[in-house]
């Protein structure tokens, strides 16, 4: 157990370090790795939404999937399976993304924002924890999306093939792929493809080996008083914060800024930061893992996680096509309505799939 905890802490430190370094090499501030934002950008790059500021096929997405695939194959853990309420998972993924884009980041970016000095993310953490507690309430009463079934290797490999196709499209850059113009928004800020892909391959490999998951830390602490994953989260924040502070002192860049106001790609509306991550946390508990974990599981051959990723992508497209996503100016009225609807829908799904009412 002690060795496992050391491995998880080391993994968290490496991930935090790499995420901060990716910002140095060009990724948006406090966004070295953000699954929600990167899926949103990729959806834009494929033309699924028309928000020109956030259009770029992020190689980190492919890297996480392929890194997890490599780890699973090397350690005999590639196990294609699926068939556990896929449409329900799609809907949960959709609304988890709506919650993330209300907050402006997935649970992992929440940690990176804290490491960059953004105190709004600590406010969001309150909502995230509350959402996890809401999910645990139903888990303790028999919530289940029922069993999975063994699938073929071809089925389990589909998401990995898609990851390779996305890389080809990024490098080939055909005319039908969209890219944010320089200076046009977060989509224009990115590290070199090789740097992004290399870092993500490492993160994908490590997270597959350690089962690193933003949901598991709090969930397992509440259910089993298990703390090893929580220490992994602390390691992410500590490593990213230390790297940010060093980079700021050496380069003079704005890698660390303590406060609420004028934080990069963030807003200061506390209520909707809380509610956005409440929705994301609640939905992800019901899904069995955070967005990063879903990417890793899809690399292992889990088609249910692949369907969840499709829900994330469609949610991102809806968020930007219909004005649901927040901006630095704050949440939109449409987004607020969508989050309230999402909380109601996720609660209904939790209740209807709980069998010891």
Where are these regions (language model features)?
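Membrane-interfacial helix-loop segments of redox and metal-homeostasis proteins
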Residues: 1-357
């Amino acid at each position: 157990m002690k060795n496992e905890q050391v491995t998880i802490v080391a993994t968290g430190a490496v991930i935090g370090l790499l995420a901060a370094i990716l910002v140095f090499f060009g990724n948006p501030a406090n966004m070295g790795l953000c699954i929600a934002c990167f899926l949103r950008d990729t959806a834009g790059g494929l033309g699924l939404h028309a928000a020109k500021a956030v259009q770029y096929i992020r190689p980190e997405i492919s890297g996480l999937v392929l890194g997890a695939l490599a780890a699973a194959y090397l350690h005999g853990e590639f196990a294609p399976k699926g068939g556990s309420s896929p449409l329900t998972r799609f809907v949960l993924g959709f609304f988890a993304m709506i919650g993330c884009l209300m907050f402006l980041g997935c649970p992992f970016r929440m940690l990176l924002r804290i490491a960059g000095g953004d105190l709004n993310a600590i406010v969001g953490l309150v909502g995230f924890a509350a959402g996890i507690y809401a999910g645990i309430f139903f888990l303790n009463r028999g919530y289940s999306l029922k069993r999975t079934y063994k699938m073929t290797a071809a089925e389990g490999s589909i998401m990995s093939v898609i990851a390779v196709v996305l890389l080809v499209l990024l490098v080939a850059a055909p005319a039908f792929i969209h890219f944010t113009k320089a200076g046009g928004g977060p989509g224009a800020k990115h590290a070199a493809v090789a740097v992004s892909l290399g870092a993500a391959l490492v993160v994908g490999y490590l997270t597959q080996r350690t089962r690193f998951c933003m949901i598991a830390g709090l969930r397992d602490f509440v259910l089993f008083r298990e703390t090893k994953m929580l220490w992994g989260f602390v390691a992410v924040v500590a490593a990213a914060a230390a790297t940010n502070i060093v980079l700021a002192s050496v380069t003079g860049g704005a890698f660390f800024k303590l406060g609420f106001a004028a934080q990069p790609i963030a807003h200061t509306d506390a209520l909707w930061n809380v509610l956005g991550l409440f929705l994301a946390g609640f939905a992800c508990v019901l899904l069995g893992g955070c967005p990063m974990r879903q990417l890793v599981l899809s690399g292992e051959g889990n088609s249910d996680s692949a369907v969840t990723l499709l829900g994330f992508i469609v949610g991102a497209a809806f968020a930007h096509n219909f004005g649901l996503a927040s901006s630095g100016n704050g949440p939109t009225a449409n987004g607020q309505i969508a989050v309230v609807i999402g909380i109601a829908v996720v609660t209904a799904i939790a209740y209807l799939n709980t069998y010891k009412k």
